[in-house]
């Protein structure tokens, strides 16, 4: 379905002509999930995003759909149970995006180690039990030192005692956002990126009745009326709440910065994702992951108080990650000049709660008896022999030894919150990408209740556990064969096999629409047929308005194809300029935007 500059302009016009049931501020994964469920449930829905979709935070993750093994370091059994069940749901509704990618976790005998081999085995067994993959081919394996090195011979051998392999999933975070957004558009939501909420409309009693918005592309200021407004702006949540608040200013969020660096796979060849302690005794762990003939690694986790729109990678971030990776891979000898791409993102964390651990460890000493008691309680809970209260009681008995004594950045809650202010503004904040659907579901239950109670408008929510995102209309049990069939269709349209498979995996059930463009398009000068089709699909069906939108978020070319990117930047600019009828001045502006994005991506300031 068309989702383009034209539909954006039409959506802005329509938003001014009616009173929406729900206006969503923020087009990251949280807002996208709410928009899909609201539109599919029949609400008159609008969504505005001040940047591009997923630009702020949701395209800057570690690009995994985590099951959350790390949460068992602090024995957050409920968190892991929720996370693995939600991961399974995301696989069902977006089967073309998450891909199984077993994770290797080497264990070292060193001070501050997160796991011993015994504790790792117990944690992995508990994880498999919660994920429902115990006694299946996907179940974990404990490895000897020799078996770890057989899988990953370039790992540091000193202190290595063994390891484990457990099931996790790779993700394309920005694609997950745009596929939710596209489905919401398909179901009737009015959606516009590059529109900023600058203030709120109020009735006589001080209740919010809409927003004052600015189209950042035209500088037009206009009003959008809505029965309910929900703030899903992630790290900006406090700022948006405070636009509407005449009294005490909210300060709920505590964003932390996470940095990832990309090198060519020749610098560090990893056969599968690897996850290990930093070796610095700081209780943290780091991922090293293969993607598109590149290897990327991260992440840092530091408090952040700077510019929310433009977090940057610092020399301190680079030194920290290179020190860790070069220690674990002694032959790598990576320097800053080897870094091809990078990204820095802000996690929208909620302060004041250390219940859930993201990348932190705990350094408490736990007895095997306590550990086994907890596991027995969880197994009894899963077989309905024990209650949730029993599990919470078992966990609480360990809190004195497992909880952080202070809120370091790695221990700030990854949980979510849904609040309604006195003026009626809803704010859905916090959470993790894996949880986005469940967060949206909880918010929509509240929205529907309020619309009924206060506006006498009745809606029945869809079952969002089975409602596919755009591109996700595949049989989850037969994804590979369906993707293969789509790829063969691409080959029949003139693509080579590698390109056809790449696009089929990227677009899922939308791949035939992408390939169909080959009938009416000529290959753009300087671009492959695959990039020509992908670019035009992004402009016509994914509201990509700039080269950076396309090169960084609709595709990951800037991150994982940096060595070949320079050759297509100008052809992409030319083709978009022709399609959008840009003036030379406009094209120069977009070229400058690409140069800024590449300078940040390439760490140009740090390398000079």
Locate each region found by the language model:
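Extreme N-terminal leader/targeting segments of oxidoreductases
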Residues: 1-22, 37-41
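Core beta-strand elements of the Rossmann-like FAD/NAD(P) dinucleotide-binding domain
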Residues: 18-20, 217-228
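Short hydrophobic core segments
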Residues: 24-25, 224-234
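Glycine-rich Rossmann-fold phosphate-binding loop(s) that bind the pyrophosphate
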Residues: 26-28, 50
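Glycine-rich FAD pyrophosphate-binding loop
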Residues: 39-59
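A conserved short coil-to-beta-strand element within the FAD-binding core of flavoproteins
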Residues: 193-209
